Amino acid sequence: MKENISQNEPIVYLLQEVPGTKIGRPKYNIIGAQKFGRIEVLLREDTQIVRSPGPITYQLRRLLKDFTDKDYLLLSGDPKVIGLSIAVACDINNGKYKTLTWDKQEKMYYSTEFNIYERGEIDEQDKL
């Protein structure tokens, strides 16, 4: 049954629990991200990469093994965990991933799509 759910509904992968979750008082509310899909927490809030990224890399590969174009990363926690999670998602999904960003003014999440293999002229001027 779980396979049918994951095939049809996008998943919002919350990289680490919201700070304060462990003591029952999360610092912020992520309920608005449910608009984009079912929220799945990958790592505990106290997870850190101190010396060796090996064990967490293995854990993230296992947890993100079904990551697809329709899924999202909700970036939270240790910057090294964020970087590693993006690298793993890119490796699994041919360089493509989407993130959710909270807009403080509009009080809502926005999606941003990335493709690290997107090609353009290297010397091309920024059009931003």
Question: Predicted segments — roles?
Answer:
Residues 75:
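Short, surface-exposed polybasic-aromatic patches that bind anionic ligands, especially phosphate groups
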Residues 79-81:
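Short beta->alpha connector loops
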Residues 1-72, 84-128:
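Long, low-complexity, Lys/Arg-enriched
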